């Protein structure tokens, strides 16, 4: 079975994670795919496959004769899809021998224009996989799941030499909790890769340092007819707070290594207002500056409107994995060789986000990220191609081969 055929099956299983539930997994529906995967893993020869009570799927393939002393390699992908777009009743569509032009998604009439998505022209002649426009596809990261299992099946069927291969599929990555209950000792790998990136050939070993901030503004309500010099409108103070942040440090104005402040939520009235931010930067020092800046703005506004008017609560989320990858840079070097062996040029770009691998790296399991061949994640224009998924699978097999020597 080719990887894309697995994706078509997995995409139809509803696994959107729920950021509000507070449970692990965040949604019981994630077990539906987990149980399907365990059954499939056992059917291809991964005899110890199981899913635990928190919806983490684990399994391993023992080393072949002569490779018992080779390092144990881990491959990890996540099963959940992002809550940013609908993930139920996904209807994948195959566009065979895609012509490289605009694509109309029939469920909504949404047009994927090459002027908006220039990469589409590079997919000409491939089998493009999209949705009907009513949902996301779930290539993030069911493509990674499919590619790992296709590589595992090939390994077993062809009896290729390899060290121990450890496989895991996680829940709740999209809400930042994919690695929270991951059993690293039980997983058994010396190091690993997440297969959760964008276009095939990508290697990611730098990610954002991340924090979140909740800004609460306490106002003072007075009848507007007699409010002069008395009312403090919390919503107005909230706008003043936000406008004190640099306009050129927002997601829509930054790229590459440039960090940002992202206003995710805002609501309020005269009496109280709240602002929810995420803060991101590859440089830990620059992230600290952003956190300090929020506190300085609050201090200024409290001086203007009175003590306690503005409160800021900041929480750290995850850290840049680079520091933990550097001592194990063979992971990057091996991935480069594997990608080149597949006839591609490695592309190494900083992740403008986070991965399970970033958290796992800081927990002691070095874990860079590899491309899956997908594009436009978290939206109805999400897509991939059968050929790029084949190539991603080939790269995984090349990595396994290189670590068996």
Feature map (PLM): residue ranges:
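Phosphate-handling active-site elements
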Residues: 153-166, 247-254, 405
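Metal-dependent amide/peptide-bond hydrolase catalytic core
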Residues: 235-405
């Amino acid at each position: 079975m080719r990887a894309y055929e697995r994706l078509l099956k997995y995409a139809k299983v509803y696994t959107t994670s729920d950021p509000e539930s507070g449970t692990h997994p965040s949604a019981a529906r994630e077990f539906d795919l987990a149980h399907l995967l365990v059954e499939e893993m056992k059917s291809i020869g991964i005899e110890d496959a199981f899913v635990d009570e928190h919806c983490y799927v684990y399994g391993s393939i023992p080393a072949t004769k002569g490779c018992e002393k080779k390092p144990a390699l881990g491959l990890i992908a996540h099963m959940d899809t992002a809550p940013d777009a609908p993930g139920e009743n996904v209807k994948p569509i195959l566009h065979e021998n895609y012509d490289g032009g605009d694509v109309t998604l029939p469920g909504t009439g949404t047009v994927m224009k090459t002027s908006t998505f220039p990469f589409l022209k590079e997919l000409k002649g491939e089998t493009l996989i999209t949705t009907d426009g009513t949902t996301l596809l779930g290539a993030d990261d069911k493509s990674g799941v499919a590619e790992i299992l296709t590589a595992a099946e090939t390994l077993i069927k062809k009896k290729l030499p390899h060290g121990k291969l450890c496989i895991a599929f996680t829940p709740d990555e999209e809400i930042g909790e994919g690695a929270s209950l991951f059993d690293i000792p039980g997983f058994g790998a010396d190091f690993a890769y997440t297969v959760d990136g964008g276009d095939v050939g990508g290697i990611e070993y730098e990610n954002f340092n991340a924090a979140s901030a909740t800004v609460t503004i306490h106002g003072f309500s007075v009848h507007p007819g007699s409010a002069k010099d008395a009312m403090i409108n919390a919503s107005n103070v909230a706008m003043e707070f936000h406008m004190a942040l640099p306009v050129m440090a927002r997601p829509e104005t930054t790229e590459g290594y440039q960090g940002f402040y992202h206003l995710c939520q805002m609501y309020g009235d005269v009496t109280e207002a709240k602002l929810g931010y995420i803060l991101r930067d590859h440089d830990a020092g620059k992230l600290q500056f952003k956190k300090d800046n929020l506190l300085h703005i609050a201090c200024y506004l409290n001086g203007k409107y009175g003590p306690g008017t503005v409160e800021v609560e900041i929480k750290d989320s995850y850290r840049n994995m680079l520091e933990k990858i550097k001592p194990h840079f063979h992971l990057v070097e091996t991935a480069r060789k594997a990608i080149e062996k597949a006839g591609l040029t490695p592309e190494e770009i900083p992740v403008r986000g986070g991965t399970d691998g970033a958290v796992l790296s800081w927990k002691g399991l070095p874990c860079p990220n590899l491309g899956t061949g997908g594009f436009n994640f978290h939206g109805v224009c999400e897509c991939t191609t059968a050929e790029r998924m084949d190539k991603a699978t080939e790269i995984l097999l090349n990595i396994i081969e290189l670590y068996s020597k």
